[in-house]
Amino acid sequence: MFFKFLNYFSKSNLLVLILLASSVVNADWFALNMTRGSTDISNEVFELHMLIFWICVAIGVVVFSVMFYSMWAHTKKKNPIPAKFHENHKLEIAWTIIPFLILIAMAVPASKTLVKIYDDEAGDINIQVTGYQWKWQYRYLEDDVSFFSNLSTDLDEIYNLVPKGENYLQEVDEMVVIPAGKKVRFLITANDVIHSWWLPAFAIKQDAIPGFVNTAWTVVDKPGIYRGKCTELCGKNHGFMPIVVKVVEQAEYDDWVYSKKQEAIKLAELTTKEWTAAELVERGESIYEVNCVACHQTSGQGITGIFPALAGSDIVMK
């Protein structure tokens, strides 16, 4: 009976198995697997993942080998009279002790890595990360620098009017900038609903929960640009909340902090400036495109029942 079933299975599913096998062979290995990170911790997480993966593969090979051998060797045709026995104490002890030792082998390195991940004390730089629908706010606590980071992908790309760029939906108008080789601590929270701040290259994924602060940290030695995203469904534009971190040398970081402080001074001066009507329109348009268009739409019509229309609104007209 078993071989009849196997024969039927082989004929009906051979093509599917061949297609699946060919897709796996031709696929990039790292497209199907966890990728290496850019920090010591993220590389430890990768090595831990691969260790447990190969342990699971070995267990699977042993278990399925025994199972298929038993199905082949102990058929009714070969053994018309079944063996009768109740227990085997040596075997029971073996299959209790061996899994216990395997779990210990996985738990020890995992615990060591977890201890390092949660050692978030005494950061050289502390950055408060606040999730909003649908953007991030970053505040550098020591330097009194604060800004919002919004998706900057062109709307024409989103609506398929032009070809999509290399970093489609992974571009922002303001990047997080941190210095290389310094311990940076992130204090992660939210203003409205639950978000999740995820940077795979740093092995960081922390929920941003209103009223709570979760912490994470990193030390990145290699300058470059690293990208992540919100990974907690947070509403209509959940997919439009990218995270971009730029790692630079200390001197460049100091220059960036200075420039942000100068921007804050200029912004404060604008509060006392006398604006012309044309300047107000231009300024309002730029602010609307950054902060309002995601909810109230380019036309100002909003979304019925969710975000009210601004076009023709008495509040706007007044």
Which functions belong to the PLM regions below?
Residues 27-51, 71-283:
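Non-transmembrane, membrane-proximal soluble domains of secreted or membrane proteins
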Residues 60-74:
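Alpha-helical transmembrane segments
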Residues 56:
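Active-site-proximal cofactor/substrate-binding loop regions of enzyme domains
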Residues 11, 15, 51, 60-64, ...:
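Hydrophobic alpha-helical membrane-embedded or membrane-associated segments
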Residues 231, 293, 308:
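Cys/His/Pro-rich metal-binding microdomains
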Residues 277-303, 312-318:
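Sequence/structural segment immediately N-terminal to covalent heme-attachment motifs in c-type
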Residues 219, 242-249, 302-318:
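Gly/Gly-Pro-rich "capping" loops immediately C-terminal to redox-active cysteine motifs
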